[in-house]
Amino acid sequence: MNTFSQVWVFSDTPSRLPELMNGAQALANQINTFVLNDADGTQAIQLGANHVWKLSGKPDERMIEDYAGVMADTIRQHGADGLVLLPNTRRGKLLAAKLGYRLNAAVSNDASAVSVQDGKATVKHMVYGGLAIGEERIATPYAVLTISSGTFDAAQPDASRTGETHTVEWQAPAVAITRTATQARQSNSVDLDKARLVVSVGRGIGSKENIALAEQLCKAIGAELACSRPVAENEKWMEHERYVGISNLMLKPELYLAVGISGQIQHMVGANASQTIFAINKDKNAPIFQYADYGIVGDAVKILPALTVALAR
């Protein structure tokens, strides 16, 4: 048996749902999708869901992860085994841990390939900081996986599809995290997975202010702006959602222009599937040049304005 009887899908990020649904279609005979509202339910059915389970009734101060209990109960009630697919976002991984505990299931994060052999999931993902690919065969009846961006192509919606909709009512968990306050985050929403051209900056750009030079290049050529993990996580110069690498975005653009990025394996795992890689770095021995199809050795602060003028013509 090379498919599961059922797969359960949930995405806290709407843009990640189409690829998860495409993976679900390849891995199971019946697709169940948990959603948070009617609009997401309609999208899920158009993407191939046979059954949509609308999570309802959560108090505003409670977290989405607190639905884990009723989600696990629903999964158990509809089969003695199954596959759960989640995005490898922060919330996806937290929810995976909670579901794994409640389903007594193995959990595998950041999966880059998934197959089914004899009714069991076989998962591949990066190990040792991206230096190797590990393969795991999950033996538990339920398997909970968080999927790396780009693992599956996006499913295409079909408005003629039909499915059944059910409601899953909120049940307060015995131990819960209560949200006491929220703080709006300034973020320009962008779907980097679909970008044809990407300009990505590393700490070699020098300062947060210098990122404006990369933004000007993006405007000139119609590219989207991304970054390395240190720029987002260490320096806090850009949003977490924009960093490329093993534990976040895995991109496949036509052009990936790396500016001031050294080229460590953890980053290149997320960019190496690009059709063309162009690197700008002042260190001629930077590892990025081993991956680049084209490269310029020099100061990005001086090169970017000249490149912007040349490409804007």
From Swiss-Prot:
**rRNA-binding recorded as keyword:** no
Q: Which SMART domains match?
A: ETF (SM00893)
Molecular functions (GO terms): electron transfer activity; flavin adenine dinucleotide binding
Record keywords, A-Z = Electron transport, FAD, Flavoprotein, Transport
Question: Which GO biological-process labels does this protein carry?
Answer: carnitine metabolic process; fatty acid beta-oxidation using acyl-CoA dehydrogenase
Q: Which InterPro entries match?
A: DHS-like_NAD/FAD-binding_dom, ETF_a/b_N, ETF_a/FixB, ETF_asu_C, ETF_asu_C_CS, FixB, Rossmann-like_a/b/a_fold
Question: Which pathway is it part of?
Answer: Amine and polyamine metabolism; carnitine metabolism
Pfam families registered for this protein in UniProt? ETF, ETF_alpha
Q: Which residues of this UniProt protein bind FAD?
A: 255-283
Keyword presence, Iron: no
Subunit structure, briefly?
Heterodimer of FixA and FixB.
Return the PANTHER family for the record: ELECTRON TRANSFER FLAVOPROTEIN ALPHA, PROTEIN FIXB-RELATED
Q: What does this protein do?
A: Required for anaerobic carnitine reduction. May bring reductant to CaiA.
The record's family statement is: Belongs to the ETF alpha-subunit/FixB family.
What protein name applies here? Answer: Protein FixB
Q: Which organism is it from?
A: Escherichia coli O1:K1 / APEC
Q: Which gene encodes it?
A: fixB
